[in-house]
Curated annotation (Swiss-Prot):
Lineage: Eukaryota, Viridiplantae, Chlorophyta, core chlorophytes, Chlorophyceae
Name of the protein in question: Ribulose bisphosphate carboxylase large chain
CC annotations in GO: chloroplast
Protein task: RuBisCO catalyzes two reactions: the carboxylation of D-ribulose 1,5-bisphosphate, the primary event in carbon dioxide fixation, as well as the oxidative fragmentation of the pentose substrate in the photorespiration process. Both reactions occur simultaneously and in competition at the same active site.
Site (Transition state stabilizer): K334
Length: 475
C-alpha cells in the first residue's frame, strides 16, 4: 500500500485519528529554494517509529493537530504543511535520529523571528511521543532573509565609526557586577578606557536597581567615556544596558543614550525577547547607535545535548533580529564551547555565505544575501595568557572581553587594561609576521613582558589559572 502523502479535499471528511506519517512523512519531497529547513535531533519514546516522530514534529510545528478536522478541506493543506523529508540515525547513539523538516515560506510572517520560533520551537517540544527533541540548525532561505533588516550597522560600519582596523577590539565587564554606586562605576569605566581598552560593559544583571539607577549610571559613564577619549585620542564606548521591564522603558533609555552621544548600547536578547530586540535594533539603526547583545539565559536553552535549541540557531536568529555584537563563548575560558562547534556559529554570525559542514555542526548552506555581520564577543574567564589562542581562533573581527582579567590586575584597573592592550598588539604583530601563535604564543607573551611591566605583573598573577573541564555539547 502506498502511503497517503497528499491531502485531497475531494476525498471527503473521515473523522478519527490517523498516523502522522501518512500525511507528513514525505521522503520523495524535493526541497524548494524558498523552504525553511530545520534539522531536529529526536529521541523517540520506546516503541515509536522514527518516521512517526519525524512526521509528528513536522505536523505539530506547522498545520497538524492530534485528530482529523473537517476544516482541512477548506484549505490547500499541501501548500502549507511541513514535511519530514529525511531521517538519519545519529552515529554512536542508540535511538537518536536527525529529522529534516521543510516548511513552506508562507507559514511565517515577514521579518518576525518571534513568529518563526513560535511555530518551529513551540508546542512540539512537549510532545509525548518524544523523549527529547533538539533543534540543531535552520536554513533561512534568501527569500525570507530579505524580509529582515539584520544588524543595525554590521562589522564594517562599526569599524568605520570607531576608526579602528587591523586588530581585534578589547572590552571589559565592570566588576563587581552589582553593588557599585554610579560614580564609582563611572570611575572604573574611565580607568579601563584610559588604560587602552576600546569598550567597557554593563553586566547583563545591571538594569536599574536601588543601588544604581539607570540614568545616574548613564550620566557618569558618558562623562568617563568622553574624558578617556579626550586623553587618548581614540574613540571609546561603554555598553549601556537598555534592557528594561517594558519596551517603552527600554526605548526611553536608548533615547537617553542617543542624546548623551554615546556610540553603543546593550540588550539581553533572550530574557528581553525577540520582539523587544527587533524594536531596539530598528531604533539603533535609525539613530546611529551600535547594539551589543548579551545571551543571558542561553545555557538553559542550548546546553543539553539532547533537548532544546543549539546556540547556532539562536545566533542565526539574533543576526536576523538585529545585533552588532553577540557573546559567543571563548573556547579557552570558563564557559562551555568546543572549538569546531564555536567556530561554526562564529562564521554564521560574521560571514555572508557559509557552506554546509557537518564537521563543524553546520547542517545547511546559509546565504545571508549581503546582510551585515554580527561581531562575536569572547568573554568569560580569559586573561593575558589566553591572548595568543584568542587571536588565533577568532582573528581580527571579534571583541575580546576581559572582566576579571582587567580589574583583577594587582596594580589596578588601568594597568590591567594596559596589559591586555600590549598582549593583543604583540600577538597581532606576531601573527602578521607569520609566527604560529598556537605553538609560539607563550614566547610572544613572555617577550612582550620585557618592555611592559604591567603585562609582566598580569602574567605572574594568572600563570596557574586554567579552566580544564570537558565540553558537554560535542559533535
Amino acid at each position: 500500500m502506498v502511503p497517503q502523502t497528499e491531502t485531497r479535499a475531494g476525498a471527503g471528511f473521515k473523522a478519527g485519528v490517523k498516523d502522522y506519517r501518512l500525511t507528513y512523512y514525505t521522503p520523495d519531497y524535493v526541497v524548494k529554494d524558498t523552504d525553511i529547513l530545520a534539522a531536529f535531533r529526536m529521541t523517540p519514546q520506546p516503541g515509536v517509529p522514527p518516521e512517526e516522530c519525524g512526521a509528528a514534529v513536522a505536523a505539530e510545528s506547522s498545520t497538524g493537530t492530534w485528530t482529523t478536522v473537517w476544516t482541512d478541506g477548506l484549505t490547500t493543506l499541501d501548500r502549507y504543511k511541513g514535511r519530514c523529508y529525511d531521517i538519519e540515525p545519529v552515529p554512536g547513539e542508540d535511538n537518536q535520529y536527525i529529522a529534516y523538516v521543510a516548511y513552506p515560506i508562507d507559514l511565517f510572517e515577514e521579518g518576525s523571528v518571534t513568529n518563526l520560533f513560535t511555530s518551529i520551537v513551540g508546542n512540539v517540544f512537549g510532545f509525548k511521543a518524544l523523549r527529547a527533541l533538539r533543534l540543531e540548525d535552520l536554513r533561512i532561505p534568501p527569500a525570507y532573509v530579505k524580509t529582515f533588516q539584520g544588524p543595525p550597522h554590521g562589522i564594517q560600519v562599526e569599524r568605520d565609526k570607531l576608526n579602528k582596523y587591523g586588530r581585534g577590539l578589547l572590552g571589559c565587564t565592570i566588576k563587581p557586577k552589582l553593588g557599585l554606586s554610579a560614580k564609582n562605576y563611572g570611575r572604573a569605566v574611565y580607568e579601563c578606557l584610559r588604560g587602552g581598552l576600546d569598550f567597557t560593559k554593563d553586566d547583563e544583571n545591571v538594569n536599574s536597581q536601588p543601588f544604581m539607577r539607570w540614568r545616574d549610571r548613564f550620566l557618569f559613564v558618558a562623562e568617563a567615556t568622553y574624558k578617556a577619549q579626550s586623553e587618548t585620542g581614540e574613540i571609546k564606548g561603554h555598553y549601556l544596558n537598555a534592557t528594561a521591564a517594558t519596551c517603552e522603558e527600554m526605548l526611553k533609555r536608548a533615547q537617553c543614550a542617543k542624546e548623551l552621544g554615546v556610540p553603543i548600547i546593550m540588550h539581553d536578547y533572550l530574557t528581553g525577547g525577540f520582539t523587544a530586540n527587533t524594536s531596539l535594533s530598528s531604533y539603533c539603526r535609525d539613530h546611529g547607535l551600535l547594539l551589543h547583545i548579551h545571551r543571558a539565559m542561553h545555557a538553559v536553552i542550548d546546553r543539553q545535548r539532547n533537548h532544546g535549541i543549539h546556540f547556532r540557531v539562536l545566533a542565526k536568529a539574533l543576526r536576523l533580529s538585529g545585533g552588532d555584537h553577540l557573546h559567543s563563548g571563548t573556547v579557552v575560558g570558563k564557559l562551555e564551547g568546543e572549538r569546531e562547534v564555536t567556530l561554526g556559529f562564529v562564521d554564521l554570525m560574521r560571514d555572508d555565505y557559509i557552506e554546509k559542514d557537518r564537521s563543524r555542526g553546520i547542517y545547511f548552506t546559509q546565504d545571508w544575501c549581503s546582510m551585515g555581520g554580527t561581531m562575536p564577543v569572547a568573554s568569560g574567564g580569559i586573561h593575558v595568557w589566553h591572548m595568543p589562542a584568542l587571536v588565533e581562533i577568532f582573528g581580527d573581527d571579534a571583541c575580546l572581553q576581559f572582566g576579571g582579567g582587567t580589574l583583577g590586575h594587582p596594580w589596578g584597573n588601568a594597568p590591567g587594561a594596559v596589559a591586555n592592550r600590549v598582549a593583543l598588539e604583540a600577538c597581532t604583530q606576531a601573527r602578521n609576521e607569520g609566527r604560529d601563535l598556537a605553538r609560539e604564543g607563550g614566547d610572544v607573551i613572555r617577550s612582550a613582558c620585557k618592555w611592559s611591566p604591567e603585562l609582566a605583573a598580569a602574567c605572574e598573577v594568572w600563570k596557574e589559572i586554567k579552566f580544564e573541564f570537558e565540553t558537554i555539547d560535542k559533535l
